[in-house]
Amino acid sequence: MATDDKILLRLANRVGIMGLLMLILPPLLAAWVYRGEAGESFSFLTHTLSELGRYDSSRLAVLINGGMFFGGLALVVSFSSRALSGRSTPISVSLAISGILLSLSVAACGLFPVNVGALHSHAMTALYVMTPVCALFYCFAILRDIPPRWGVLPALAAAGCALALLLDPDRELMLMDRYAYGLFGADRPTIWWPALTGWLLVLFVGIWLFYALILMRRRH
């Protein structure tokens, strides 16, 4: 491999890891300082990612939305750099495509927070649709040529969570601004399954993208 290619791939690795950190760390910080409209603390069991990115009620909403947008774009750059390298194969390109499309969907959710209404609903719905689509590309690459086979598990789990949210009959209502507050007020249930499922989706997508970055690095 040429020296320039090595430098490019090393930079792509660092950009990808930085992108993942921008997706992971902001929700933890924002949840820590969050106070809802009813004065309640944040719970990953009852509050959604959309609420954490709501500008009027979340103190660090700009960190959440900026992290998703710029983190998603950083991952797009990372996967694209690997796909365009001289040693790419059809299998590695398939792996990169899944990462690029999924990262773009994540970036769109950060660009359009819940305060913008319909655009946020469209962005989240696109994420729910693209997750199983990207999982097909990813699983094809893993099962065809890139062991170990258990690497498909986070993608399959993410696809399952995304489909559950996509097929929920109340999906459009749940993606509306202040829907949870109007539904529960200050008395939220111990577990609100749409919120928990949404965070499981975020968790599995994060593991999936991290593992995809590792696989792409190994193949180069």
Predicted regions and their residues:
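Hydrophobic cores of alpha-helical transmembrane segments in multi-pass inner/ER membrane proteins
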Residues: 20, 67-77, 129-138, 200-215
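C-terminal TM-helix exit segments that contain a strictly Trp-centered aromatic cap at the helix terminus
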Residues: 25-35, 108-113, 160-175
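Interfacial/capping segments of alpha-helical transmembrane domains
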Residues: 31-47
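Membrane-interfacial loop-to-transmembrane alpha-helix junctions, especially the N-terminal start
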Residues: 89-99, 147-155
